Design a protein with these regions (language model features):
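Alpha-helical scaffold domains
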Residues: 1-94
Length: 94
């Protein structure tokens, strides 16, 4: 977890993206605190229209929504600065 938190704020997009997507597929083993910790610092990058950041945020949230839809809805509601793409992807199957 400490490594992923470091990677989430790395200067390189692809390192940040690995941190954001590291728990995709983990289902109920997903750590929601860690997920938020790696996504939140990247929301400003998503606002800068960096496609791969916006897509990764949405993908990570969409995947976790299969396990914890209420958590994902609450996360999206708490972050109105999410890009449209991230928001659409997160809520796609809800």
């Amino acid at each position: 977890a400490p490594t992923l938190r470091e990677w989430a704020v790395d200067e390189h997009l692809w390192i940040r993206r690995v941190a954001m997507l590291a728990q995709v597929g983990a289902g109920p083993r997903t750590d929601p605190v860690l997920l938020a910790d790696v996504l939140v610092p990247n929301i400003p990058y998503a606002g800068e229209q960096v496609f791969f950041s916006r897509k990764a945020i949405g993908w990570a949230l969409r995947d976790y929504a299969r396990t914890e839809p209420d958590w994902v809805r609450a996360f999206v509601a708490a972050h109105p600065d999410l890009s449209g793409l991230s928001r659409r992807e997160a809520l796609k199957h809800l």
